[in-house]
């Protein structure tokens, strides 16, 4: 009742009370009232950041994009942002028809800007992301949650270009995650290689290349002088950009995996030598670690399992280990992406938790590689339910894992 009475007045004494009554209006479906509350606060405090942000999001959710942009530009001024441009961008595929058909394809784009936080491409009010790098733009530091209710439009605040790239180059991009690097940056290069274009132009990549990025680039035979390196969290203006589309369909992923196996064939163990049983350890990380990993290894060791820590191995060593495996037991994590180097007959036991079981990348990959996969899901956490999130460590039922392995042997 106190909240209900508060919502009937335009007097807002502080940010907390303001957000409370705006939230209540939105919950009741009173969009117009929520906007009036914002305007009322701005009538008292003309450049109030809280009111401007709430009003901008209300307008964006209501589809009044141009009005929202004007409000967000006022936020820039309040925050003292200089040398930035805030504008709306409509999300678009490189080629929606070919994307829907699940094809592997590429497209030339002229006079574009590339932001190097989420590696999206922007031009003339269009943002290319879904088949370019496919990160969730809602969390982009340039977007900061400013996505329309229907998901078709974003508002981004971009700095002026830090890099001017006049020569044609290939959009490779960068990612801090080993798995994402393989799937978002390397796999798509298959399309250009088969078209005879992969080495015709320099590659656009992040300047702070991780060791595994450097190693994959070297293994693919690209020369250091053929890399165009740009810093992260910046904008690069590109005169002409060759953009291979992400491989997202089973059909395209399958072609990409086959290409990678062909390119790295000299590093793969012979199929007859693929007899090893691997437990893939995450003991070198804290995120989503397996709390009873030692207990699990003790249970699997009598069955001939050896434990490896991929984070402590070079790319070549990881490829060798996974390509020589007959059974792989692994907690859900980036290193399991190396299963694409294992033979088709290799069985996978994926260990996951209820917090991340919706992440189905490895099941999708197994479907394209035709590798048998068993997923074991745990709800055994060291925390109470309200504290659990996607990176929470978990325990696994070792008996279930052993039974799954015995069924696969």
Regions found by a protein language model. Give the residues of each.
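Structural signature of tandem alpha-helical TPR/SEL1-like repeats
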Residues: 28-37, 64-71
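Structural register within alpha-helical repeat arrays
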Residues: 20-21, 55
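Canonical positions in the second alpha-helix
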Residues: 5-7, 40-41, 74-75
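The feature primarily captures lumenal catalytic ectodomains
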Residues: 54-57, 61-73, 77-409
């Amino acid at each position: 009742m106190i909240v209900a009475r508060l919502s009937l007045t335009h007097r807002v004494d502080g940010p907390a009370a303001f957000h409370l009554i705006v939230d209540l209006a939105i919950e009741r479906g009173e969009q117009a009232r929520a906007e009036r509350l914002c305007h009322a606060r701005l009538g008292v405090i003309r450049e109030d950041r809280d009111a401007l942000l709430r009003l901008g999001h209300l307008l964006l959710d209501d589809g009044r994009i141009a009005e929202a942009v004007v409000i967000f530009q006022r936020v820039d001024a309040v925050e003292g942002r200089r040398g930035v441009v805030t504008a709306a961008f409509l999300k678009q595929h490189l080629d929606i028809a070919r994307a829907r058909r699940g094809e592997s394809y590429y497209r030339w784009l002229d006079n574009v800007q590339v932001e190097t936080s989420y590696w999206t491409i922007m031009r003339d009010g269009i943002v290319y992301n879904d088949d370019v790098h496919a990160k969730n733009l809602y969390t982009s530091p340039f977007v900061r949650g400013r996505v329309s209710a229907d998901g078709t439009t974003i508002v981004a605040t971009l700095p002026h270009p830090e890099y001017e790239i006049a020569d044609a180059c290939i959009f490779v991009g960068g990612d801090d995650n080993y798995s994402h690097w393989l799937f978002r940056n390397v796999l798509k290069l298959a399309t250009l290689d088969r078209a005879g274009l992969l080495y015709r132009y320099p590659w656009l990549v992040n300047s702070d290349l991780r060791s595994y990025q450097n190693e994959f680039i070297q293994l693919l035979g690209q020369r250091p002088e053929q890399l165009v390196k740009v810093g992260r969290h910046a904008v690069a203006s590109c005169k002409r950009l060759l953009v291979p589309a992400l491989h997202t369909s089973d059909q395209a992923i399958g072609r990409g995996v086959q290409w990678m196996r062909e390119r790295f064939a000299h590093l793969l163990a012979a199929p007859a030598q693929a007899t090893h049983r691997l437990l893939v350890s995450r003991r070198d990380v804290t995120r989503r670690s397996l709390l009873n990993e030692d207990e699990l290894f003790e249970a699997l060791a009598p069955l001939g399992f050896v434990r490896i820590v991929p984070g402590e191995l070079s790319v070549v060593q990881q490829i060798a280990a996974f390509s020589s495996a007959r059974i792989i037991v692994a907690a859900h994590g980036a290193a399991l992406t190396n299963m694409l180097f294992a033979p088709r007959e290799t069985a996978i036991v994926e260990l996951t938790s209820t917090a991340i079981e919706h992440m189905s990348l490895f099941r999708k990959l197994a479907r394209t590689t035709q590798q048998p996969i068993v997923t074991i899901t745990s709800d055994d956490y060291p925390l109470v339910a309200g504290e659990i999130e996607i990176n929470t460590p978990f325990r696994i039922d070792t008996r279930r894992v052993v039974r799954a392995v015995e069924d696969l042997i």
